[in-house]
């Protein structure tokens, strides 16, 4: 009897769960941007009948429910669920999608355009997931990945305007130069905008503009700026701008401005003039803790000791300087107030390079070294795209001799010494060129 009782106790213990599984929600099928297909997912470690899914989409700066008529999505017995997220307007062009696993009895907030999701969704849900959709025409340029903005035939800001991701509006040519173009098609004007996939934070943002931009049509704006979709972020969307435009005032002798948002605050904006016919030009801003320094050059910037004439500089240390967060880098070409170019002509701006220089660039790491049959020394490194690197050599650690400089086209790059020889001892060092 004692043996049997003991065995039953052991079996009873083993049949009980050792620990509770954590509820989870995942997205199993996310339709590409522009698609009207449904969103699908999986709820795990919950009783399906006791829970529902609340889905929200983020379109052009606003969170909303795809439909107020069916605010909660039913979970099937196997944990799968499907939601129609394109119930009207520009829903197909949502850049973010959020799904919350909530109790069946929960009444979710019905959002028809708010800048942030209510905090109650986090406290009321047992699990959540958010995804960011990328552009179907995303591309790689200057060492980084970029999305192309499209409004799908709807008016989006800034402007508002129609934005197109067509290769008639945004493309990289065979020389590696980025083209942004405002086009006219079937009586409609389409603008262009690209957005970096990553945030960069503190450092120098440098734009090498090939085109003559002092004479842009008065209704046209060229914007080079950081921007955080979250309006509650410090510093007015963490927006720092180089903007080239006369803002529809053809008589304005100034054609450009540096801005720390919000621009309405006194001292957060300065206007200036790009010289007539100046091309190429280089426009930069260095963002650091509590400070931003802007500078524009008449020509392609190169590090010292070379020099390029400065057009203007401006520094701001006011209270609007943001700290880094989830800002992305934007480059756009658009129409002020959505007004067509006054001359009726299409507009194009070509940018040869973009470079980001961290405040303290890291020393590149060596991936491999080799000496080929011709005696050329090859050094494969990993650093930062578009930075200048200097290769030097020495036979005895006395005098270091410069062997050459290069701009790293990608994070991985190569330096070479054609004068190397297996019969001669040499030591090498690689450094980030100062003054970038």
Task: Label every model-predicted segment.
Residues 32-33, 195-205, 271-279, 322:
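Extracellular/lumenal carbohydrate-interaction signature centered on repeated Trp-anchored short motifs
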Residues 205-207, 279-287, 292-296:
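Short tryptophan-centered beta-strand motifs in secreted/extracellular beta-sheet-rich domains
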Residues 21-134:
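Ser/Thr-rich low-complexity repeats and stalk/linker segments
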Residues 231-279, 291, 334-337:
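Glycine-aromatic-enriched beta-strand/loop faces of beta-sandwich-type recognition domains
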Residues 6-17:
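Bacterial N-terminal signal peptides
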Residues 134-232, 236-248, 306-309, 327, ...:
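Low-complexity, Ser/Thr/Pro/Gly-rich disordered linker/stalk regions
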Residues 66-81, 91-93, 102-106, 135, ...:
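Aromatic sugar-binding interfaces of carbohydrate-active proteins
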Residues 361-436:
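Short, composition-biased motifs enriched in small/polar/acidic residues
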């Amino acid at each position: 009897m004692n043996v049997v009782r003991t065995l039953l106790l052991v079996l009873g213990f083993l049949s009980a769960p050792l620990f509770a599984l954590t509820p989870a929600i995942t997205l199993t099928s996310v339709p590409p941007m522009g698609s009207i297909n449904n969103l699908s997912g999986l709820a795990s470690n919950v009783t399906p009948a006791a829970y529902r899914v609340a889905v929200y989409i983020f379109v052009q700066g606003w969170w909303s429910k795809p439909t107020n008529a069916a605010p909660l999505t039913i979970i099937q017995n196997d944990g799968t669920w499907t939601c129609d997220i394109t119930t009207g307007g520009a829903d197909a062009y949502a850049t973010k999608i959020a799904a919350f696993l909530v109790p069946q009895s929960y009444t979710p907030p019905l959002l028809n355009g708010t800048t942030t999701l209510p905090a109650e969704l986090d406290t009321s849900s047992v699990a959540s997931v958010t995804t960011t959709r990328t552009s179907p025409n995303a591309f790689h340029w200057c060492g980084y990945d970029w999305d192309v903005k499209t409004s799908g035939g709807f008016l989006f800001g800034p402007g508002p305007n129609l934005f197109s991701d067509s290769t008639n509006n945004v493309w990289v040519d065979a020389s590696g130069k980025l083209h942004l173009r405002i086009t006219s098609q079937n009586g409609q004007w389409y603008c262009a905008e690209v957005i970096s996939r990553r945030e960069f934070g503190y450092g120098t943002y440098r734009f090498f503009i090939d085109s003559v931009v002092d004479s842009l049509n008065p209704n046209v704006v060229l914007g080079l700026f950081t921007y955080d979709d979250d309006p509650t972020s410090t510093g007015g969307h963490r927006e720092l701008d180089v903007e080239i435009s006369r803002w529809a005032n053809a008589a304005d002798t100034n054609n450009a401005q540096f801005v720390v948002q919000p621009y309405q605050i006194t001292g957060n904006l300065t206007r200036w003039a790009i010289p007539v016919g100046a091309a190429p030009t280089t426009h930069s801003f260095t963002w650091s803790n509590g400070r931003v320094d802007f500078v524009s050059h008449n020509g392609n910037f190169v590090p010292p000791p070379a020099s390029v004439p400065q057009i203007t500089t401006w520094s701001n240390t006011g209270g609007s300087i943001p700290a880094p967060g989830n800002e992305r880098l934007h480059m756009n070409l658009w129409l002020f107030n959505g007004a067509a170019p006054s001359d009726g002509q299409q507009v194009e701006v070509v940018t040869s390079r973009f470079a980001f220089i961290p405040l303290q660039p890291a020393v590149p790491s060596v991936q491999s070294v080799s000496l080929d049959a011709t005696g050329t020394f090859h050094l494969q490194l990993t650093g930062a795209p578009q930075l200048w690197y200097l290769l030097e050599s020495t036979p005895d650690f006395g005098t270091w001799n410069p062997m050459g400089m290069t701009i790293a086209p990608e994070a991985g790059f190569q330096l070479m010494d054609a004068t190397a020889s297996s019969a001669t001892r040499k030591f090498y060092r690689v450094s980030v060129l100062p003054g970038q």
